[in-house]
Amino acid sequence: MNPIINFILLFSMMAGTILAMTSHHWVYAWLGLELNTLAIIPIISKTHHPRATEASTKYFLIQAISSALFLLSGITNAYLYGTWDINHLSNNFSKILLTIALATKLGLAPVHFWLPEVLQGVPILTALIIATWQKVAPMALLIMTWNLIPTPITLTMGLLSTIIGGLGGLNQTPLRKMMAYSSIAHLGWMVIIITIAPNLTLLNLTLYMIFTSSAMLTMHLTISKTLQNAMHISHHSPIITSLFLLSLLSLGGLPPMSGFSPKWLILQELTLHHLTPLALSMALMALLSLMFYLRATYISTMTLSPSIITLKTTWRLKSVSTTSSLSMLTPPSLLILPIMPLLIQ
């Protein structure tokens, strides 16, 4: 793709996200979401492969339907109450429509079916954008309207997302599909606490983006697409192998990694609000996600590829820019837990 066109698309994608995040008017927020969607469609389909075309078509249809539901929610509220302000949502039907529309854009269960298929059909860097940056605008709108969203719906979606994210990732060998189900499970943790403590949702989203970026940049650097390819990571560099292991363990939420802190705080908040059975269910469902993270770490770091040719370790990494971005993302994904008391005050 032409670098100028690529820059325009990335700039439009960022501008759409910022417009949606900062808007309190229904139409402006909808325009931001649409600009974001239309900018990433050419990025998804730029490889000229049938799977990329299929992924871009699925992504466009799902995002168009969710945008229509979002706009219908605003029009219904404006027709009944005469206001276009997002924070003045008084109709229950509009609240439910808004929740369903944003849940579809995020890929929350039970409207999650598009996310694994789309991520499997795109390159890893494009999958990274879909799994991280494309979650910012819908999640910002959910945080903006946290006091208007029906709590039973968010609790149900959150628990269902952690169950489906954990169960769906157990039998996956493609790494992109595994990261898609990981994204669904993490989104469940964010949504289940959003009407109780929205600041924890924002913290969880920030840490999730750091962890996922670190893991997927390692996959891109080592050209790993499946668990079988992950056996070759140790031939690139022992340091990269160690960073990949620690990033996956942080995604799984094992202490003392940074990924343990948001789960700990969310479980504590649920318990304080007398939702102990729900907190126990979330903790048990987190073990399902931890299972496939541990399987990926075992295969990538403790097993060798059954290759006839003796492979030498590639000590010289290919991309300086990718390595530098990975080196900036990895320390926060490992070392935030000791300073967590300062972050939550």
Swiss-Prot record:
The entry lists its GO molecular-function terms as: NADH dehydrogenase (ubiquinone) activity
Which InterPro entries does this UniProt record tie to the protein? Complex_I_Subunit_2, NADH_DH_su2_C, NADH_UbQ_OxRdtase_chain2, ND/Mrp_TM
Membrane topology recorded in Swiss-Prot or TrEMBL: Multi-pass membrane protein
Q: Which reaction does it catalyse?
A: a ubiquinone + NADH + 5 H(+)(in) = a ubiquinol + NAD(+) + 4 H(+)(out)
Q: Which GO terms describe its cellular component?
A: mitochondrial inner membrane
The primary site where this protein sits is mitochondrion
Localization: Mitochondrion inner membrane
Give TM segment ranges.
1-21, 25-45, 60-80, 113-133, 148-168, 191-211, 239-259, 274-294, 324-344
Keyword ATP-binding included in the entry's annotation: no
Instruction: Output the GO biological process annotations, alphabetical, semicolon-separated.
Output: mitochondrial electron transport, NADH to ubiquinone
Q: Would the keyword Transport be found if you checked this record's keyword annotation?
A: yes
**EC number(s) from the headed UniProt entry:** 7.1.1.2
Q: Which Pfam families match?
A: NADH_dehy_S2_C (PF06444), Proton_antipo_M (PF00361)
Record keywords: Electron transport, Membrane, Mitochondrion, Mitochondrion inner membrane, NAD, Respiratory chain, Translocase, Transmembrane, Transmembrane helix, Transport, Ubiquinone
First-tier enzyme category under EC: translocase
**What job does the chain carry out?**
Core subunit of the mitochondrial membrane respiratory chain NADH dehydrogenase (Complex I) that is believed to belong to the minimal assembly required for catalysis. Complex I functions in the transfer of electrons from NADH to the respiratory chain. The immediate electron acceptor for the enzyme is believed to be ubiquinone.
Family membership, please give it: Belongs to the complex I subunit 2 family.
Mind telling me what this protein is named?
NADH-ubiquinone oxidoreductase chain 2
Name of the gene: MT-ND2
